[in-house]
Amino acid sequence: MIDIRSDTVTKPSKEMLEHIITAEVGDDEYKEDPTVNELEEFTANLLGFEAGLFVSSGLMGNQISLLNHTNPGDEVITTSDSHIQNYEHGAASFLSRIQFRNVQHKDGNLDLEDLDTQIKKSFYHKPNISTVAIENTHLSSGGSIIPFEDIQKLYEYTSSNNLKLHVDGARVWHAILENDTKSNYGEYCDSLTFCFSKGLGAPIGSILLGTKSFINDSREYRKKIGGGMRQVGIIASAAKFALNNRENLLDDHKKARKIYDE
């Protein structure tokens, strides 16, 4: 029996466990864990960002981004079926004290005309719209991929309208590898988070990416919500191993198509 409930039910391979056992560790609260430091720098460079922050989950990464990009009372534009709005236990209203505004979309890809209409409707009786959050791949649309060129267009729009763009990229490596697209997301969004424990196969962990200033502030927010960790290189080593073997996702895609076709 193959368990296909979720890509989160995977267990570490023997090779991954060996990396965990032999990981070099230190106190990450003091930025002294070499494995974490290496992972953060490597991942940031890989996706074109200035810096990264290792966090326990994608939810934590998303919520720290909102804490960074918004002020209490702001609105964040996203899709009505997004993970950040529907599947994070109301964390955005609890932590950031913001609300969401929804726009039309096709498979997670925002309708720019509707987005523009919503932005231009804003006036002093309405909440300030500060951030746009998209999800790539889009879970509620069956894991659909937002074309990279559409993210570029969206970022041009958000930048010209003084809005921040956050990408919930929990499974973004599916999109990057499947379409063999550019991975320089750092040029086309203000922040991005992705999970090592989804698809990539690590047991724990996600990473939040952005500018150095953004990540410095995010480190403080992580501490405030109890996300600071100590000898976390033990799990960061598994994340690095998973990321170095990301090409295996293409085999997963072939197997998924075979199951679907049969």
Predicted regions mapped to residue ranges:
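Conserved PLP-enzyme active-site core in the AAT-like
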Residues: D3-E262
